[in-house]
Amino acid sequence: MSTSVAGVLAVALLVAALWVTYRPFGDYMYRVFAAKRHLRVERAIYRLTGVNPDTGQRWPVYARSVLAFSLVSVLLLYLLQRVQEHLPLNLGFGAVGPALAWNTAVSFMTNTNWQAYSGESTMGHTVQMTGLAVQNFVSAAVGIAVAIAVVRGFARRRAPVAVGGPGGPNGPGGPGGPNGPGAGSRDDVIGTGDELGNFWVDLTRTVIRILLPVCVIAAIVLVAGGAIQNLHGNRVVSTLAGGHQTITGGPVASQEAIKEFGTNGGGFYNVNSAHPFENPTSWTNLVEIFLLLAIAFSLPRTFGRMVGDRRQGLAIVAVMAVLALGSFAVNAAFQTAHHGTVPVAVGAATEGTDTRFGVPNSALFASATTLTSTGAVNSFHDSYTSLGGATLLFNMMLGEVAPGGTGSGLYGMLVLAVVTVFVAGLMIGRTPEYLGKKIGSREIKFASLYFLATPAIALLGTGVAMGLPGERASMLNSGAHGLSEVLYAFTSAANNNGSAFGGISVNTTWYNTALGLAMLFGRLLPMLLVLGMAGSFARQHPVPATAGTLPTHRPQFAGMLGAIALIIVALTFFPALALGPLAEGIH
């Protein structure tokens, strides 16, 4: 079977698997956050931490909880790295330096997993298991929790009548009451106040009911495929050529599962998913791609269930799918364009790819990992053709909404939907409404700042790095490609992706500090802004739909939504792209 046929087959299987799981997995996540009962282990956690799980939080309280948990996570992971030499299973590694420890702590807390170090030669098993792997779970859970809180903001109904009374929405004769048509289906789940839920409950449920069960199964599947899972240290073995090689073992499969499923991306080994201990075969490669896309492509179904209109979720996921498939097609085309002597001879640009996967499956993995916030790699992105690499860069510049990271993809797409409805409202001269909520100046300010925050961080960081002579010395390439590498690094950090072009010596005090700040603000600023927007929507009374209301579930709206996403990227990043990968491609 040729690699092209294998690539087409892999895409077909992947699309089929995602479509089959879209409904059941999306419905399952809906039931997780709709459930009134708490599991016994959850109640124990709430008692231990002093959390009242039945108390709702308005958006400022929810946001403060996110900030507090995130900053404590950074501190604990930083301290764990700094005392590594005193920990068991440290494999003889000493304490991680202050700048690198800061960068790594922020990286894993923000779900970025940017790695300025080689995992097998820097981190011992204790730090890997109790620090990095734990953050892989909770950072993904934070993103999902924020997404669910944002959806609640759109779905909330403020009702002045007494809840539970005869005429109230949950009373005996009310629409959500036991005898009403809604019979406990929606108001019981969403509520009628302006609270966005309880962050600690959302976080706990996400980890225990969603991430842990799937990752246990996924780890077993990966072990069956050849991924390793042990507590071995470094072993020196004799090679066939008569030399010696050091092989590092460790709890790889368990970390690989959450690395992909939580769209984290940080590898146990320096070469990430190109290492045969992490990603042994072509079918485990497909399993890993499925894992990193599963949550992001199923959350729109959860969204549709929560807002009471499943068609809204279908419209969102359709835009995600079209953008994702288009990106893969363009990237694969650029990688097989046959420009140059070697690509013509072998049929594709194979530098930096693994022969186990070939160009199509490498391009598929690269597209999936940059369209989400994963950042894992099974090929060397810096070796892609200039326009192939530009496609990966463009994927991150989209804000990773096609489908995006765990949670961040959904709430990013919802902010895009708000902007799209606002633009459409301006064109027809009506007050814009989305899901029964009016979009006023307050909401559009939050949305505008959301789309300005990440590009500003990425472009400012790139500009400063290019302007400092000392930091330019860290670049191993000059010209357009050198600019592309720096732009890629800060775009990856600001968008919490974590993949890299390489070509830069980033384990320096300046780069560790600057990229750490880019990751921190790139994660927390958009979260705070989108929670503020959700809180503003939650305070509103729903507006009944009229003949002039824009239908947001139809193909016309989906087309506008995709166009707005592309236009925002083009207007924001085109000058930088023109100076970097586009200039290199034309040359």
From Swiss-Prot:
It is a multi-pass membrane protein. Residues 164-183 have a biased composition (Gly residues). The gene is kdpA. Residues 162-188 are annotated as: Disordered. The keyword Transmembrane applies. GO terms for cellular component: plasma membrane. One of its GO terms (molecular function) is P-type potassium transmembrane transporter activity. InterPro entries: KdpA. Part of the high-affinity ATP-driven potassium transport (or Kdp) system, which catalyzes the hydrolysis of ATP coupled with the electrogenic transport of potassium into the cytoplasm. This subunit binds the extracellular potassium ions and delivers the ions to the membrane domain of KdpB through an intramembrane tunnel. It comes from the Bacteria. Belongs to the KdpA family. This is Potassium-transporting ATPase potassium-binding subunit.
